[in-house]
């Protein structure tokens, strides 16, 4: 019987262990998509206690606590940090079988060094004291943890109207050598159907010093902000796409009319919404291509399902799930519309519904281009797929239908500075899968070949892709 989460956790054979320890384990982290607050990095936040760094904003943990029957006051309410922590300690033993159980113990192991101890109500007080003492040390500040985890790059998620003042401060700080770059998230400008669209356009007018009275002036305003992001080192754009829409792009006169209808609070048809979003995304794709940015598309979330809790807590609070819309044809036509003028940027496609894995894995082959290895990527298992089975499915289907060797690897997609251990989780799963291939005679026992492939997937491919 194996020991729980020992040093060889998830590594069942000698090949997997060699690949992990000799090629994967010590690779730096290129975390190209996350939701860390740049303010906390710029100000090098020192967290007061374990609840602040571990539970605040972590909707994975919040969902588990709700499923365990924990009162909302002990999750997002006014209970003390210690009370919230104790509620989490009571919840964790109930999470066996959920990746949260593994993540919890990995997050205690690194960076806190707590091993051979199960997290539960009995161990909670000792762990609380030990971790809170460590959190007062410089090595456990926001920047200190990033250094401990060997992070080389962090791509945050930012709105076009953001000032990026904290990215500027980080870049100008000669005492901090980790690159922190903004990522452009234009959802509020693209999704003309959102209730807050008109208020957002007013904000965009202010920050861009541009009156938006038509589609061309909207592009001018966004172009100014694109330049601002580019100046601050942006390498990537990210689209959240609950619905993948496509419609043939009409002339600019019709786009002006659609925008004017919306500015006048008039209802739009589904066709008009699709025409507007298609036109803007195709234009944005060309702008990304011109700046050599990567375009990421996160497809298939069903958001804010619980109206009562949305009114109470707002978005990103743990009330989202997997949607089941089909979107293959719309996605194909959208990518093709960008590609027809050779203006499809490097692109990473993520799907939330694992049903869509094979579709995405084959879709990327339609738009690959000579001169850019792996130009179009099937992104790592996202959100609800960010677990052992989900990661294995994505890796297997990419390897079967594309080129695993060109994969840009893992990202945290997290709001927590303790989530970097997800890279370790991914690397162990990757090495175990390849190790099984070798043991079964499905891949050669060539450590130079396989080791370099693992090394590339863990770091080098992403570094080259986002250059």
Curated annotation (Swiss-Prot):
Domain of life: Bacteria
Keywords: Isomerase
MF annotations from Gene Ontology: glucuronate isomerase activity
Positions in coiled-coil regions: none
GO biological process: D-galacturonate catabolic process; D-glucuronate catabolic process
Annotated organism of origin: Mannheimia succiniciproducens (strain KCTC 0769BP / MBEL55E)
NCBIfam families linked to this entry: PRK02925.1 (NF002794)
Enzyme Commission designation: 5.3.1.12
Gene that this sequence comes from: uxaC
Name assigned to this protein: Uronate isomerase
UniProt pathway: Carbohydrate metabolism; pentose and glucuronate interconversion
């Amino acid at each position: 019987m194996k020991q729980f989460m020992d040093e060889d956790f998830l590594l069942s054979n000698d090949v997997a262990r060699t690949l992990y320890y000799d090629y994967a384990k010590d690779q730096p982290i290129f975390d190209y998509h996350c939701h860390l607050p740049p303010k906390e990095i710029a100000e090098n936040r020192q967290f007061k206690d374990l609840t602040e760094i571990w539970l605040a904003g972590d909707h994975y943990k919040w969902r588990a606590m709700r499923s365990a029957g924990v009162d909302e006051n002990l999750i997002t309410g006014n209970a003390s940090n210690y009370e919230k922590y104790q509620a989490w300690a009571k919840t964790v033993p109930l999470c066996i079988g959920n990746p949260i159980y593994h993540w919890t113990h990995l997050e205690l192991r690194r960076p806190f060094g707590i091993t051979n101890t199960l997290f539960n109500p009995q161990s909670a007080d000792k762990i609380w004291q030990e971790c809170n003492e460590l959190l007062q040390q410089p090595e456990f500040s926001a920047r200190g943890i990033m250094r401990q985890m060997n992070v080389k790059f962090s791509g945050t998620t930012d709105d076009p109207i953001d000032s990026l003042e904290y990215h500027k401060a980080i870049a100008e700080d000669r005492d901090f050598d980790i690159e922190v770059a903004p990522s452009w998230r234009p959802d509020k400008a693209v999704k003309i159907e959102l209730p807050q669209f008109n208020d957002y356009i007013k904000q965009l007018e202010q920050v861009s010093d541009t009156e938006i009275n038509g589609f061309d002036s909207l592009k001018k305003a966004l172009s100014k902000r694109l330049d601002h992001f580019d100046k601050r080192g942006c390498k990537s754009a990210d689209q959240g796409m609950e619905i993948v829409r496509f419609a043939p792009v009409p002339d600019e006169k019709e786009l002006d009319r659609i925008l004017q209808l919306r500015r006048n609070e008039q209802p739009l048809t589904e066709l008009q919404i699709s025409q507007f979003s298609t036109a803007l995304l195709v234009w944005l794709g060309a702008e990304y291509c011109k700046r050599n940015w990567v375009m990421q598309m996160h497809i298939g979330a069903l958001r804010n399902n619980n109206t009562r809790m949305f009114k109470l807590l707002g978005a990103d609070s743990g009330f989202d799930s997997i949607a089941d819309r089909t979107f293959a044809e719309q996605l194909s036509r959208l990518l093709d519309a960008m590609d027809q003028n050779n203006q499809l940027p490097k692109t990473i496609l993520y799907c939330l519904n694992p049903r869509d894995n094979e579709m995405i894995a084959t879709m990327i082959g339609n738009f690959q281009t000579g001169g850019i290895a792996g130009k179009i990527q099937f992104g790592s298992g996202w959100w609800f797929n960010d677990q052992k089975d989900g990661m294995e499915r994505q890796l297997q289907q990419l390897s079967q239908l594309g080129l695993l060797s060109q994969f840009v690897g893992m990202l945290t997609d997290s709001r927590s500075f303790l989530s970097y251990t997800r890279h370790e989780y991914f690397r162990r799963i990757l090495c175990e899968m390849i190790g099984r291939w070798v043991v079964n005679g499905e891949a050669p026992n060539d450590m130079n070949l396989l080791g370099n492939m693992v090394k590339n997937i863990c770091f080098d491919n992403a570094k080259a892709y986002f250059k």
